[in-house]
């Protein structure tokens, strides 16, 4: 990746390490993420974000038939409700992405609601106790078990 960036001649800075990555996250107003651990990191450092993701049709079909969870975003799974908008498959459009970006940038209550959710996520993960990945794994397993009841 470093060679490709260097060859491009573009003013791109590659950051390494957790602190540099989190500082880079916090330098923006809103993030668009593809879910996974990066979205959980964004929540931990209070960066408003949305999830935008498309998968191949076969993957979508398999997921719908074999994986029964209400949300894909880790913060949403942990909280049992949507605090991070999930724009998946046909909902992943430029118009919908821009709508949510504008909501976070122009409407303080929308922004505050997500920040409140992130505070709850950090508490659920027991930040400062076990490692965040261990806490996340335990909380997600618990959330999935509760959802299936």
Segment roles from a protein language model:
Residues 1-149:
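Nucleotide-activated sugar donor-binding and catalytic core shared by glycosyltransferases
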